[in-house]
Amino acid sequence: MDRQQQLRRLQGGLIVSCQAPADSPLHQPEIIAAIAVAAVQRGAVGIRLDTPEHVRAVRDRLPETPIIGLWKRTFPDSSVYITPRYVEAEAIAAAGADIVALDCTLRPRPDGEDFCQIIPRLQQELGCAVMADIDTLEAAIAAAKAGADLVGTTLYGYTEATQGQTPPGWDLLETAAQQLPNTPVICEGGIASAQAARQACDRGAFAVVVGTAITGIDLQVQAYVTALNARP
């Protein structure tokens, strides 16, 4: 299946991000895979995953489901952490991801790499589609020019350039969808209800990624407990 066929399978649908904090008991490949299977059985068109181990586990359970894979790694010389280098992207592709997600914000990467070089290598050498996780319209345009198959609003509100902003970035989504008619725009971040997911598509999203609101047990419980403990 070529890259365009993979993208068409996502159009208009829900992609569930199945991730857990590293210190969570849910951060086990077999548990993440079970969560992913449950999501697909209920209609999710794709799954977004962190780490090669989790991608591999889900691929074994869901051989036909589109997987967006990434690898979060931190480095002292860069604030980029979503698939920061080609070596991480290559490992995610080798684990079975159809689409590799990487930070395509306009920030310096570790080892001096550039997403403009990583994107074509993934497409040409490995045959993978690329989802560019961006924070601003400028970054979205740059990623599209570099050949990204998709752009996602994933990092809106999480970078220095968008500090103080709260996702979802509706204006960013709408403007990117208008200015990049040939590059599908994925809405990711801050989608906390089914109604918000539908609103994202109404505003131009090609598809919607939802994580915390569906699979984020650790963060959801913490939020409830914090609210209850704040009572006088």
Swiss-Prot record:
Enzyme class: isomerase
Entry's EC annotation: 5.1.3.9
Biological process terms in GO annotation: carbohydrate metabolic process; N-acetylmannosamine catabolic process; N-acetylneuraminate catabolic process
SUPFAM superfamilies (UniProt xref): Ribulose-phoshate binding barrel (SSF51366)
This protein's UniProt keywords: Carbohydrate metabolism, Isomerase
Pathway annotation from the record: Amino-sugar metabolism; N-acetylneuraminate degradation; D-fructose 6-phosphate from N-acetylneuraminate: step 3/5
GO cellular component, one term: cytosol
GO molecular function per UniProt: N-acylglucosamine-6-phosphate 2-epimerase activity
Chemical reaction(s) catalysed: an N-acyl-D-glucosamine 6-phosphate = an N-acyl-D-mannosamine 6-phosphate
InterPro entries: Aldolase_TIM (IPR013785), NanE (IPR007260), RibuloseP-bd_barrel (IPR011060)
HAMAP family named among the record's database cross-references: ManNAc6P_epimer (MF_01235)
NCBIfam families: PRK01130.1
Main function: Converts N-acetylmannosamine-6-phosphate (ManNAc-6-P) to N-acetylglucosamine-6-phosphate (GlcNAc-6-P).
Family: Belongs to the NanE family.
Protein name: Putative N-acetylmannosamine-6-phosphate 2-epimerase
Annotated source species: Synechococcus elongatus (strain ATCC 33912 / PCC 7942 / FACHB-805) (Anacystis nidulans R2)
Underlying gene: nanE
